[in-house]
């Protein structure tokens, strides 16, 4: 996995943009190079949002565009569309190699290693506390401000909303104050 390059495309909410930054930091810490364009990357990661149906259609169109480049790419679909569609994604588009729910991002490096054994990879478990513990260590502050996730999900189950089903039930970091303090620069 050391010599690989990757590109991340984010759809949807601010949380997805933040999660994409965490994925980028995690993969860079493993020696992978972040590319600005999918054509330059070995691995293309689509971080998806399932709030609007149009996002899923856009995802499949974008995967088609990557396939038209004519180069073999590893394609990972992560986020809420991956959670909602689960293994059905492999049937809808045969070029998808990894399907990863929003609470399993931290497993991506291992899944990439396992993929080298020619097995398509899927993980849509709700293992929220592991993600919080692992990914909080991966982020580097950028500039004078930084995002810190202290809570994710929702437990309200509104009839019109998919968040509890595709993101997770409400989860709050066990020690939000400590998490915020640990992310502050020592000179603050």
Residue ranges and their predicted role:
Residues 174-178, 182-188:
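Positively charged, low-complexity/disordered segments
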Residues 1-173, 177-178:
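Proteins enriched for Cys/Gly/acidic motifs involved in redox and nucleic-acid/cofactor modification
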